[in-house]
């Protein structure tokens, strides 16, 4: 949909139920008929629900390419990469704006964090040198994911914990300065009572769920840095979604400009981070330039 909005004249061919075994033929059919020059203007967008399958498809597609036949590949499985990038960037933005600093050294709790958005956010937070707690009702699932991310990053920054009960969820947030609710749509993960009684160190809380009941009680979907508890500032799903849409557009545009390359969560986050840091800088400059007699 976004690609059509950005490039209404583009020819888009859709392949459904693609398996890893299908990839080679699809890539070759895209590369060869138009020659090396035409290949530069042919892009592949990998969607999908299961991140393992998405990564397997990406790996196979990349192996099919060789000079001068190389295509740009965009990867955003059901919007998970751009959503996670926007969520992490927004929490960074308000951590800085509210005077709590960058993500480095922070403890982050990602509630219901084993889904596509949660695990992508965990990778991004860990890459920013934060300590990450991933919760799941299934302890083994959380631990397995944490181990996999640590192995990828060659660092011990992520841990998985069980959070099947309200008390377990609350305890998972006790040390967190930032909390991200990454659960399924229409599911409340964190009550205001848990946030108040357990997450006493929390300064920024974000929610990716825009369908009532929302993931965090008391955090409205359109909240954009609203103080929901003393010194705890909330970011709702619509505020995250607005940045997500901007990131997706820029990701697609970037891939169309470049003749080759992989445009994944790392590139998406770089775009999101740059966007919020530039906005933060502009807001600080505007505040500094405001005459003192205008201030309350």
Regions found by a protein language model. Name each.
Residues 1-69, 268-289, 293-296:
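N-terminal ligand-binding/catalytic initiation module
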Residues 75-93:
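A glycine-rich, Thr/Ser-enriched phosphate-binding loop motif common to dinucleotide/cofactor-binding enzymes
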Residues 84, 115-121, 142-143, 187-190, ...:
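Short glycine/serine/threonine-rich phosphate/pyrophosphate-binding segments
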Residues 66-74, 104, 229-231:
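Glycine/charged-rich beta-loop-alpha catalytic/anionic-binding loops adjacent to active sites
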Residues 211-296:
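Adenosine-phosphate binding glycine-rich loop
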Residues 32-41, 67, 126, 171-175, ...:
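Flexible, charged surface loops at secondary-structure boundaries
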Residues 94-178:
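Glycine-rich phosphate/diphosphate-binding loop of Rossmann-like nucleotide-binding domains
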Residues 156-234:
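Rossmann-like adenosine-cofactor binding region
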């Amino acid at each position: 949909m976004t690609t059509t909005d950005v490039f209404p004249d583009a020819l888009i061919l859709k392949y459904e139920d693609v398996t890893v075994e299908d990839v080679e033929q699809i890539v070759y059919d895209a590369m060869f008929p138009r020659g090396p020059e035409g290949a530069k203007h042919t892009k592949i967008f990998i969607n999908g629900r299961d991140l393992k399958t998405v990564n397997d498809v990406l790996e196979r597609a990349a192996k099919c390419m060789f000079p001068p036949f190389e295509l740009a590949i965009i990867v955003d499985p059901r919007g998970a990469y751009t959503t996670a990038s926007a969520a992490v960037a927004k929490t960074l933005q308000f951590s800085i704006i509210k005077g709590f600093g960058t993500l480095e050294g922070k403890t982050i709790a990602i509630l219901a964090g084993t889904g596509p958005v949660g695990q992508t956010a965990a990778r991004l937070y860990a890459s920013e040198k934060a300590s990450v707690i991933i919760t799941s009702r299934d302890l083994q699932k959380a631990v397995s994911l944490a181990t996999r991310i640590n192995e990828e990053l060659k660092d011990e920054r992520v841990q998985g914990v069980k959070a099947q009960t309200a008390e377990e969820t609350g305890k998972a947030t006790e040390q967190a300065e930032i909390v991200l609710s990454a659960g399924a749509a229409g599911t409340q993960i964190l009550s205001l009572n848990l946030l108040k009684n357990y997450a006493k160190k929390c300064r920024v809380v974000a929610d990716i769920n825009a369908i009532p009941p929302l993931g965090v009680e008391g955090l409205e979907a359109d909240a954009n840095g609203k103080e929901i508890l003393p010194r705890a500032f909330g970011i709702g799903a619509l505020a995250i979604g607005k940045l997500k849409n901007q990131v997706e557009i820029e990701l697609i545009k970037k891939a169309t400009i470049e003749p080759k390359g992989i445009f994944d969560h790392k590139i998406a986050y770089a775009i999101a981070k740059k966007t919020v840091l530039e906005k933060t800088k502009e807001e600080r400059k505007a505040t500094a330039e405001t005459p003192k007699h205008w201030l309350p």
